[in-house]
Amino acid sequence: MASIVASKRIPLFRLVEQLLAASPAQGAASALRPVAVAGGSRAYNTGAQLRRHERDESDDDSGRGYDTRRPTRDATMPAFFSDVFRDPFSAPQSLGRLLSLMDDLATPAGRAGAATLRRGWNAKESEEALHLRVDMPGLGKEHVKVWAEQNSLVIKGEGEKEAGEDEGAAPARYSGRIELAPEVYRMDQIKAEMKNGVLKVVVPKVKEEQRRDVFQVNVE
């Protein structure tokens, strides 16, 4: 073989191709790894999250490629839902979106999805006012601030570090900003009450006949 390479000066990769072509069919077939096919025997959940995984070639091929495990957070719930009053750097949320979430939870599917997720706040709107409730366990009224600025309702709360806690432990913090239309709500008449770790905020609404952005049209 060495004499052939020396005499004909065949490149190494050409020689490898010739050797592979001359191998028995059964030997070539044995060198091929079987491909696992995800057939109909695997039951898929339509509500499960489908994620693509890149694995090393040394991994087992069985069930390779996709992970159908259900994510820890229910897929029907928005990511910001449980943290709307927890993330100090969260972007302002529109009132319409918050109320839409409450409507979704009122449906059977929404109640089922919220069963595994503790809701720490509630929002509802009546003809007279907007009512908000925020759970802030461990906090008193001296730890909470509520104010209105730039057409937004801002709620912030920060607890105190208790004696005996780890130095790296941070006190409980709550923060939220909700955009409100000034022509609909009386931003200068907001009322807030903190009692037993629960903050209740009431934002009065402008009466229909007093709204400047509503114009009645006569029907002829």
Curated annotation (Swiss-Prot):
InterPro entries, A to Z: A-crystallin/Hsp20_dom, HSP14.7/HSP23.5/HSP23.6-like, HSP20-like_chaperone
Residue stretches of biased makeup (Basic and acidic residues)? 51-73
> What's the protein here called?
24.1 kDa heat shock protein, mitochondrial
Q: What domain of life does the UniProt record list for this protein's source?
A: Eukaryota
Presence of keyword Magnesium: no
Pfam families per UniProt: HSP20
**Organism, scientific name:** Oryza sativa subsp. japonica (Rice)
Binding partners and assembly: May form oligomeric structures.
Q: Which family does it belong to?
A: Belongs to the small heat shock protein (HSP20) family.
sHSP domain residues are 112-220
Instruction: Show the transit peptide stretch.
Output: 1-21
